[in-house]
Amino acid sequence: MKSFVTNWLSGLAMGVLASATITVQAATDQVIRVGVTSGPHAQIFEQARRVFERDNPGYKVKIIEFNDYIQPNAALDAGELDANSYQHRPFLNAQIKARGYKLYAEGKTMIGPMAIYSRKYRKLEDVPVGARIGIPNDPANESRVLLLLQKQGIIKLREGIDPLTGTNATPIDITENPKKWKFVEIDAAQLPRTLDDLDASAINADYASKAGFNPARDSLLVESGDSPYACLIAVRDKDRAQPWLGKLVQAYQSPEVKRYIETEFKGGILAAW
């Protein structure tokens, strides 16, 4: 009987010790807080999170979703996030210039092609003279649309526009507009809702996807795959040497995540690596 009690107590002690060890281990996991915009960025980063946590014991990723393009950088700069994943370099550069953020970008993630959609017209050439076209009201994406239209030969911009150096185009930089299109600047998140009122609107891929659009299938005009507007993972400048950053990029750029992008979005979103 004494032997039984001794063995039972010994087993109980070992169980308590094992439980405590697991609890301590869980408590020491480093949590990386990553901000994303809802839609494709959130969906894809969930896949990257799974790969990252699988391959890097001791780390956890907490994904925090936002519904606009301004707050993820504000939260990152304020230390409320450790990283974000939703923006291309021209947008980041514009935010740094305008707001004084000390942010650093590492690793390409995906390209969400900018595209022009309409509920009134099926072809770009059908959009009439004097049409009202919705475009994003942030400098980087507004410039992106105007450069796309210039590449298509619909408008012409003044010389010297280079979004990668922060020289963005606005409607006042249009020097030729033979179709006399009127550009209406609207918050990017609201552009899908404008399609009943405007002749057409240029919509970022994440907001287009949330509204049920696929740029490869539904648009009048879409960026090509060689677009310079690849999205990135951003951190505060002081965190650029953190060991988890390279691991996070590696997880995002894994074969599993690429396969998910190709299967889930069917050309509507492209892997940028």
Sequence positions of predicted segments:
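A conserved helix-loop-strand patch within extracytoplasmic ligand-binding domains
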Residues: 106-156, 258
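Periplasmic-binding protein-like
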Residues: 106-118, 143-150, 209-273
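Immediate post-signal peptide segment of exported/extracytoplasmic ligand-binding proteins
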Residues: 24-33, 54, 124-130
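Short helix-initiation/N-cap motifs at beta->coil->alpha
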Residues: 63-74, 161-193
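Bacterial N-terminal signal peptides
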Residues: 10-20
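Short, polar/charged alpha-helical segment
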Residues: 31-32, 38-62
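Beta->alpha turn/N-cap motifs
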Residues: 39, 67-69, 79-80, 84-93, ...
